[in-house]
A protein has these predicted regions:
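H-loop/switch region of ABC-family ATPase nucleotide-binding domains
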Residues: 93-94
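Hydrophobic anchor residue at the start of the ABC signature
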Residues: 47
C-alpha cells in the first residue's frame, strides 16, 4: 500500500518506504491489505506514511491510540527522533501522557477556539 502511494507521488523509492515501515515496527515483507491489519498495525502504517518522505512538518492524530504499551513506547521514541531530525510535529491527542512526554507547547481547543496554551495543561 505505501509503496503504491509513494510511486503515485513519484517522490521516494522502495528503500525509503521499507525504512519507514521498519521504523514503526512492522515487517516490509508483510503484504496484507490495509483492512486486514489490527487497529494498532493500521496506526503504525499511517505513521509510516506520515514519515516516509521525511517532511519538515508531520501532523499526527492520536498516534498512540490502539497500541499496546510496547507500541506506545516505540511510537513515542519515533516521534522524538523526528523532532531531533528537525521536524515540526503537530499532534492532536486526548492522551495527557502523550502531551506530557512529547509536547513542547500544548493548546487546549474547544469549539474551534484556543482556551489555554502552555507547556502543560
Amino acid at each position: 500500500n505505501l509503496l503504491y502511494l509513494a510511486q503515485l507521488k513519484g517522490v521516494i523509492g522502495k528503500r525509503e518506504v521499507e525504512e519507514a515501515i521498519q521504523r514503526v515496527g512492522l515487517d516490509p515483507a508483510d503484504k496484507r491489505v490495509f483492512g486486514k491489519y489490527s487497529m494498532g498495525m493500521k496506526q503504525r502504517l499511517v505513521i509510516a506514511q506520515a514519515i516516509m518522505e521525511k517532511p519538515d512538518v508531520i501532523m499526527l492524530d492520536e498516534p498512540t491510540n490502539g497500541l499496546d504499551e510496547a507500541g506506545i513506547k516505540e511510537i513515542r521514541q519515533l516521534i522524538e527522533q523526528e523532532k531531533e531530525r528537525g521536524a515540526l510535529i503537530l499532534l492532536a491527542s486526548h492522551n495527557q501522557e502523550d502531551m506530557k512526554i512529547l509536547a513542547d507547547q500544548v493548546y487546549k481547543i474547544a469549539d474551534g477556539r484556543i482556551e489555554r496554551k502552555g507547556t502543560e495543561l
